[in-house]
Amino acid sequence: MRRRFFSILYRLTGHWMPDSYLYIPFFGRNIHISIGLYYRRFLASRAIKNCGKNVNFERHARFSRSLSIGDYSGIGKDTYVPSDVTIGKYCMLGPEIVFYTDNHNTDRTDIPMCQQGFKSPRPIVIEDDCWIGRRVIILPGVTIGRGSIVGAGAVVSKSIPPYSVAVGNPARVVKSRISTSALSTDSN
């Protein structure tokens, strides 16, 4: 009941607060005001299942109450995070990201697709220290490995290995962030 109350309060009032990091010129200096950051963090941390410390929820960020997000992570403007999503520590999520954890059934051809219902939700996991760019679409069952970067506008339909850079539609890995020799010493 308590989480529901704070979730409703966040939805009703959180978007009215200023941006998380607002700089106002004052006698030749930029004054940093972050009341929106603290207000949304206060409400969201009480509305979701697991909220790490120093998490940032930008204006118009929406999420389910079952969200689990790690320390020092941030959700960008106009991003929607449904249920069954886990976000690790130190993750940067850009604006307008869309997560899909479920989808329509389309297996049968004898009845219309709109009457076939939904497939079971498949969880999405974003491991620690990831950067997800603007307008990325992440499809059901995907895991984005630790330290990975997903470029703006990518459609992620398959899991991304750790320390990778993925871009495009569909997203494909274009490079590794670390050398293979560093990977082998990391695992020992």
Residue ranges and their predicted role:
Residues 162, 167-170:
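Acidic, glycine-centered active-site loop in nucleotide-sugar glycosyltransferases
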Residues 34-41, 61-70, 74-142, 169-170, ...:
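Flexible, glycine/small-residue-enriched loop-and-beta-strand segment within the central core
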Residues 72, 147, 164:
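Catalytic-loop signature of eukaryotic-like protein kinases
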Residues 134-149, 154-158:
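Beta-rich strand-turn-strand
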Residues 51-55, 88-91, 145:
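Short, conserved structural micro-motifs that define repeat-unit consensus positions
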Residues 104, 145, 161-163:
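Short conserved catalytic/interaction loops centered on acidic-Pro-aromatic/His motifs
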Residues 5-64:
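Extended, small-residue-rich solenoid/repeat segments and analogous flexible loops
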Residues 1-6, 179, 184-188:
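Short, Lys/Arg-enriched, disordered terminal segments
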